[in-house]
Structure formats: C-alpha cells, structure tokens
Amino acid sequence: MDFVHDQLATGRKIRVLTIVDTFSRFSPAVDPRFSYRGEDVVLTLERICKTVGYPRTIRVDQGSEFISRDLDILAYQKGVVLDFSRPGKPTDNSFIESFNGKFRSKCLNTHWFLSLDDARQKMEDWRRDYNEVRPHSAIGNKAPISL
C-alpha cells in the first residue's frame, strides 16, 4: 500500500490510497480522498477484504497513516503482518512504486478531475482496465484477474 498525490481541476489536493498484490499484480483498490488518517486506511481495507480476504502481509512505508494505532489493531486482530519498508528506501516497496508510476502516467496525467466523484470514477475505470484487460509481462503477459 502507498499513497499518490494529485489535485482536482479546482486545485484542491487529493490523496489516493493504492493497493497491489505483489504476486498477482491485482489491484483491489485505488481510493481517492481529500485527506487520509489511519482509521480511513482501515475502513478501505475492511471494505476490500470482505471481497478478496485478508492478506498474510501488507508492505507499507513509514507514513503516519500506516504506523497508526488503528491499522496496528486491525492487523493484530486479523493476523496480518505489517512489513514496514526502511525510511527513505522506496526500492523496498518497488511493486507499489512501479504501479504508482503506471497509475500516474496512464491515469492521473491524462485526466482532469472535476470533482472527487469524477476522480473516483475515472480511477476505478483505469483500475478495472489494469486488472482485467492489460497484460503484465511479470505474470506471463496475462491480466491480473486471470490469476
């Protein structure tokens, strides 16, 4: 998990929580909001894990939303290990950084977001294409949904 920053056409800043499975490259969520706290990360995880289940491990950086008490409690309750990357070492979480680069170049840089709802819809459309249509060389030129 990681965050990407962008803005609406009005200039109002948004933060997007990006989540990717390192094995299948499947992205269960890209979730834009005006602000994020630890409890917001937990709400997003609980929503998506109802569908895809809880992972064994979640790799995150040292951001305040990820070192929060809320996320720590959820991880403890669900038996999930939080694997923190070393401060200042984005290569420790290279899968999500690669995903974020594709997300920025193919979605964020190609759209104007007129509202948060507009951003949510355009990002969801991109995420579905990424998961269901786009072949990934790292997984044998298959779409992540096929794994």
Label the model's feature ranges:
Residues 1-147:
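Charged DNA-binding/catalytic regions of mobile-element recombinases
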